[in-house]
């Protein structure tokens, strides 16, 4: 619901695709497989997120993109969702502005899931980095995971559920 969204809100969704299942497995059965951040684009609340496989046009590539909330939470992509909020709206707005700049700069999706390289970003890394640009050392309280699955083997990964467990965020809506 667009009226519930505020600039800087962190939105989580759980999808049913192959990538979603891999993320959930990496997260030991976590509830969410994807995360984005709400930005104000000319008065319209939009979601900036880094996502593989959701292309908008022929020859599109995996990248940081911006979607309407109804597109981000499409029932074909989403089983359930949640909206989290940071208490300081000024900081949240700065994080959203940073995310919007990253979207405008055409950052591509980080298939290496490398937290130390911000030239490419995956979904959780994008939101963490946006809040870091707003002065928050780690919106996920520094939680990192080493993931060792047959198709998903990475170190120091931030998972979508880490936002859910953050002491700095409050749930404002769940569906």
Tell me the role of every PLM-derived stretch.
Residues 1-4, 27-29:
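Short, surface-exposed secondary-structure edge patches
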Residues 6, 31, 94-98, 122-129:
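Extracytoplasmic/secreted proteins, especially bacterial periplasmic and envelope-associated proteins
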Residues 7-11:
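Loop/turn positions that initiate beta-strands
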Residues 13-82, 108-121:
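Glycine-rich catalytic cores of cysteine/serine-nucleophile enzymes that process amide/ester linkages
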Residues 15, 39, 51, 73, ...:
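Sec/Tat-exported extracytoplasmic proteins
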Residues 54, 90, 146:
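Residue-level detector of flexible, active-site-proximal loop/helix-junction positions
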Residues 82, 89, 93:
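A contiguous binding-surface segment within folded domains or other stable secondary-structure elements
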Residues 111-175:
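Activation targets extended, charge/polar-rich intrinsically disordered C-terminal tails
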């Amino acid at each position: 619901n667009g009226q519930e969204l505020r600039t800087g809100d962190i939105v989580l969704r759980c999808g049913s695709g192959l990538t979603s299942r891999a993320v959930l497995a990496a997260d030991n059965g976590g509830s969410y497989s994807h995360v984005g951040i709400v930005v104000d684009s000319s008065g319209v609340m939009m979601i900036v997120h880094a996502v593989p496989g959701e292309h908008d046009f022929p020859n599109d590539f995996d990248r940081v993109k911006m979607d309407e909330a109804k597109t981000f939470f499409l029932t074909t992509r989403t089983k359930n969702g949640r909206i989290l909020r940071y208490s300081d709206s000024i900081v949240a707005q700065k994080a959203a502005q940073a995310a919007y700049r990253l979207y405008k700069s055409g950052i591509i999706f980080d298939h290496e899931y490398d937290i130390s390289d911000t030239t490419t970003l995956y979904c959780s890394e994008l939101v963490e980095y946006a809040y870091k640009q707003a002065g928050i050392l780690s919106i996920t309280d520094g939680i990192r995971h080493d993931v060792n699955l047959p198709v998903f083997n990475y170190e120091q990964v931030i998972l979508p559920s880490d936002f859910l467990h953050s002491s700095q965020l409050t749930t404002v809506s769940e569906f």
